[in-house]
C-alpha cells in the first residue's frame, strides 16, 4: 500500500465517508462498510480529495489529454483533480463536464469547459452498476474522442449479478483500465493494522469471501 492510499483511508474515515457497521445497499446486500463520497463536503476536504485523485492519476501512468467529470458527482471531483494536478504536479490540463439537460441558449449544448477531444480520463466516485459510465462512453464517442480510462475513489472488488464486478465488465466491454485511489484490498490491510478498527476486519473479510471477485 502506498502512503497516499493509507492517508486516503484515514481521511475518509475521519470525514465519516468510510464507515463500518451494518448497511443495506441498493443491491439488497447487507454490507459491513459504507462509502459516501458526498460527505467530502467542505472546501478543505475537496482540496485534499483532489490531491488524492491527482496522486492516483500520476501513479496510474495513464496517458490522457483531458479530464472529464460526469454530472453530477463527477463535476467537483474532476475540477479538484485538475487543480491538484496543476498545483502539485505541474500538469496544467483541460477539464470538462456534461449537463444532464442540454441548453438551447447561451453557449448551448450539453458539455461545459474544455472541448472533449483526444484521450479522455473519466473521474468519478465509484462504479456500482456501470450504467453511468456507459452513458459517459457514448458522450465521448459522440465527440469523436477516445476514453483513456476511468479513475474512481474506491473499488469495492465486488461482483454484480454474474461472476464479474461492474468494473471488470466496463474494462471488458470498452477495453480501458479502471483504476482507483484504493480498493477493498487496501481497506482490509488498513483494518488489520489499526488496533481501534481491527474489530471490523472479520465482518469485512466474510463479506469479501461471499461477494468478492
From Swiss-Prot:
Family: Belongs to the purine/pyrimidine phosphoribosyltransferase family. PyrE subfamily.
InterPro entries for this protein: OPRT, Or_phspho_trans_dom, PRibTrfase_dom, PRTase-like
Pfam families the record matches: Pribosyltran
First-tier enzyme category under EC: transferase
Functional summary from the UniProt entry: Catalyzes the transfer of a ribosyl phosphate group from 5-phosphoribose 1-diphosphate to orotate, leading to the formation of orotidine monophosphate (OMP).
UniProt cross-references to Gene3D superfamilies, sorted A to Z: 3.40.50.2020
Source taxon at top rank: Bacteria
Example GO biological process: 'de novo' UMP biosynthetic process
Catalysed conversion reaction: orotidine 5'-phosphate + diphosphate = orotate + 5-phospho-alpha-D-ribose 1-diphosphate
CDD domains, per the entry: PRTases_typeI
Record keywords, A-Z: Glycosyltransferase, Magnesium, Pyrimidine biosynthesis, Transferase
Name the UniProt record assigns to this protein: Orotate phosphoribosyltransferase
Molecular functions (GO terms): magnesium ion binding; orotate phosphoribosyltransferase activity
HAMAP family: PyrE
Keyword Glycosyltransferase attached: yes
Originating organism: Pseudomonas savastanoi pv. phaseolicola (strain 1448A / Race 6) (Pseudomonas syringae pv. phaseolicola (strain 1448A / Race 6))
E.C. no: 2.4.2.10
A GO cellular-component term linked to this record: cytoplasm
Keyword NADP: no
Subunit structure: Homodimer.
Binding of 5-phospho-alpha-D-ribose 1-diphosphate, residues: 26, 72-73, 99-100, 103, 105, 124-132
Membrane-spanning residues: none
Pathway recorded for this protein: Pyrimidine metabolism; UMP biosynthesis via de novo pathway; UMP from orotate: step 1/2
Residue ranges that the Swiss-Prot or TrEMBL entry lists as coiled coil: none
Chain positions recorded as orotate binding sites: 34-35, 128, 156
Cofactor requirements of the protein: Mg(2+)
